[in-house]
Amino acid sequence: MDDKHKRYFQYIISDLTCLNSDVIRVFKKVYSIDEEPELSEIVKGEVDFYSHCVTSAGIKRGLWEKVGNIKEVGEISHIIFKDKMDYTREDIKDDWRIWRINQNIIHVGKLSKENKKGFLGLVFTPEDIYYKIKNGVHYGFAAKYE
């Protein structure tokens, strides 16, 4: 996050529905840079958001580092991703699709109240993930659709 604070995320699964990309869960808790919490405690924390990305690219670009491996990934069946057919047309409100990890995409048209809470189903760059972790929102066009 910055030179005094850090947050953690966890790779949980690859989503064949979304280009076989990595799905991560980002935890809300902010730690001081000197803290070294147990991974088993981190993964019990509240999840801020789920997202698709390429985790290895973030390591190569120096945006994050791998600190360990823990098999506990939590329940994933409740995670809903949403995707708009045309992000250039904000005026079109009935072109949404949703899916759950590794399940079929469903064209739903307008988003229901539950589906509006879904996470954007785009494969974000490491820089996009880093920005959202640091600022709480995506930047650019994606911010309009969160």
Regions flagged by a language model, labelled:
Residues L19-G45:
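Short solvent-exposed strand/turn elements
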Residues I42-E146:
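Beta-strand-rich cores of mature extracytoplasmic or soluble domains
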